[in-house]
Amino acid sequence: MRVLVFGAGGVGLYFSAVLAQAGHHVTVVGRPATVTAAGQSDLQLTTSGDVLAVSGIQVVADIAEARTDPTADLIIVAVKAWQVSAAATAIAPLVGAHTVVLPLQNGIEAADDLANVLGPQHVLGCSCVVIAKRTEPWAVTCLGAHAHLEIGPISNSFAVELISIVAALREAHISVTLSKDIRVTLWRKFMLISSYGGVGALSRQSVGVTSTTPETAALIRDAMIEVLAVGQAHGVALSHQDVDSMMAVFHAFDPLTTSSMHRDLLEGRPSELEHQSGAVLRYGRAVGVSTPIHWSIYASQLPADIAARKPTERAP
C-alpha cells in the first residue's frame, strides 16, 4: 500500500514507523531537519522499552517531491489542528479516485476541514488514541499501548473500499474499530483530550498526578461534563456513560502521560488550545451553554500560546 504521512511530529513518525515495518511504501512530509536526520540513520521507534530501527521510509520537505509517485492509497494527516486546511490544499494533487484521507488530530473539526477541500467521499472521521512523543527529529517513543483508531465515514457519499485500509492498519499492530456514529466517537475523544489535557496544562502535571489527586480528577470529570452538555445541545447523542467511559480511559493511561497540547505549552510551542478548550467555548457559546472550567483553562493558557506564535518568541 502507498502511504503518505503529512507531518513528522510524534504521531506522524509513529504511524510512519509501524506501517513501514509492516511492509508498506511510506513517504513522510516533514521539516528540513527531519530530512537531514533521516539521511543519517533509520527511524528509531521505541515501544515498551524495545528499540526498533525502521528503514525504507522516503522523507521529503516539499510535497512536490512526492507528487511524482502514483496517487496514494492512504494519506495520513498528522499535522496540528490549525494546519489542517493548508494540508488539505497541499495533498490534493495526490488524492486519486480511491484514496482514503485519515486525519489524526484532536478535536472535532479536522475531517470537515479536509472534506471542504477534498470532498467527503475521500475523508474518514477518526478518533486516534496513542501517546507518541518525538524525542529527536528522526526518533519517536510510544508510551503505553499501540495506537487504537475508531474510524467512520463523515457522510453517505464516502465511496472508497475500507477493507484493505483496515487490514493494512491492523497488520501494523494498530487496533481499528469501525464506528457506528463517527460524530459521537469524535465528541467522546474531544471530551477526553480537552479535559485531561486542559487540566494537565493548568496544573502542569502528568496523568500520574492528576488521576491520583482527588481534586484534579474531579476537575477533569467536571470538565468532561461541560463537553457533554455542549455536545448534547448540538444534537450529539452523548450521555453520562460516555463521561464514565472516558474517565476510565484517562485512569488507564501511563502515569507519565501528558497531552501534546500540554507539552507544547510547556515547551513554548504553538498549541491546539484554540481547537480544544477554545472549541468547547465556541461551541458552547453558540448554543448558550456555560463552560467555566474550559474558560479557566483557555484564559490561563492563552498568553503562552500567543507568545509561542510570535516569531521572536517561538522556541526553535
Where in the sequence are the language-model features?
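Short, well-ordered alpha-helices that flank and scaffold nucleotide-derived cofactor binding pockets
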Residues: 17, 21, 89-93, 116, ...
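Rossmann-like NAD(P)(H) cofactor-binding subdomain of soluble oxidoreductases
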Residues: 52-139
